Amino acid sequence: MNAVLIQNMLSEKEATAYVASAGFRAGSVGSVGTELEWLVRDPSAPLSRPAPDRLRDAVRDLPDPLPGGGRITIEPGGQLELSSGVGASLAECVANTRADMALLTAAVEAAGLRLEGGGLDMLRPAFRVLDTPRYEALERFNDRSGPEGRVVACNSASVQVCLDSGDDTDGWLGYRRRWWLADAMGPMLLAIFANSPGTAGGHRWRSTRQVLRFAMDAGRTRAPRMTDDPRKEWARYALAAKVSVVASEDGADWTAPEGLTMRDWLRGGGPRPATYIDLEMHLGTLVPPVRPRGYLEFRMIDQQDGENWVVPVALVTGLMDDAVTAERAAEIVRPLRSLRRNHDWVTAARRGLGEPGLTEAATACFDLALEGLDRLGAPADIRERVADFAQRYTVRGRCPADDVAARRVRAAVAVAA
């Protein structure tokens, strides 16, 4: 056996401790980041999928990292993702990401392509354009539970909001309560920003992207249980999840044995001993709505049109990073958690703000967030964009998906005429 591999062999006890500590790094609150995924289309050939080489050529001359600290990656289906640098504040994150997005947009348009807002590409069949051992193994793993995984991997786009885990106190800036609040607000955030209308399973959905994700392997896509010890629960969740990728350095297939969990592997049930690298790769494949990665990663939000990605980043920050606002927001969303678990998330994906009480709660949370953003010193233009979004959609019980659906109806009527 390779000597380096032996040195890095991992026990179940070591893995449990690592996942628990790495998931929630305790510290002060205030840093903000975002990851913006964009669908990419050639307007002259809207049903085609730009090849990876064309995408690489489009961004080849951009610096890495970008001036604002962001980095560009190509996703499995040819989506482009901008991962922002870590801002010391919301204002810094938004300013830097706007500057980086301007460079990315200009480069893409100069190549004859277009970045599209929206959570799901409903026009093109799901097709993976990147051929890497990891993505090939993930696709084989997802295929075991149905076709949804390919669609999510290749045709979806989201806004991910990244905030500090929180400190080690028991207050609303402590990681225990922040984890609870992030989960409790999650279905509401999903409903507010739903932007991928479609039909699946005989139902119409506001966020088809998210319901397809929930239809994948439940052990890696559904929310962990809410307990008094989030570190312990996250370690349990991660080790109970099935392994989707087993890396190899000799060119062998990376496909994981069917049914193998991380705990099974740590107990000797895998094709070889598990290492810290394997564990980190496994953690990176888990996609619950809120994922602890040393910070909190909000993953339930569909991509928005234009610069409206700013709104979820600001809303989540305003509700989470001001202690007064966080405590009041908790009281608003607490009654929405009557059933908990998967039902709340699926209902939000299907009905958006049509669920009884959700519009009122969301509107109240927007008002709270604006107060919190003011106390956090957020610039006026960010607060105005948040307020405008709320007036256009939330207070009317609408979400961006309703606009998309209405445009499709008008287009269908025009064609029929």
Task: For every predicted segment, state its role.
Residues 1-149, 155, 180, 194, ...:
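Terminal catalytic/cofactor-binding subdomain
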Residues 40-43, 84-86, 163-167, 300-302:
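Short beta-strand-to-loop capping motifs
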Residues 44, 166-168, 188, 304, ...:
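A very general structural signal that marks isolated residues within well-ordered alpha-helical segments
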Residues 79, 158-162, 297:
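Active-site scaffold segments
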Residues 92, 164-166, 170-175, 300-309:
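Conserved phosphate-binding loops in nucleotide/dinucleotide-binding enzymes
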Residues 109, 116-146, 152-291:
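Loop-rich catalytic cores of soluble enzymes, especially ATP-dependent carboxylate-amine ligases
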Residues 256-338:
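Long, well-ordered mid-to-C-terminal structural blocks that present hydrophobic/aromatic surfaces
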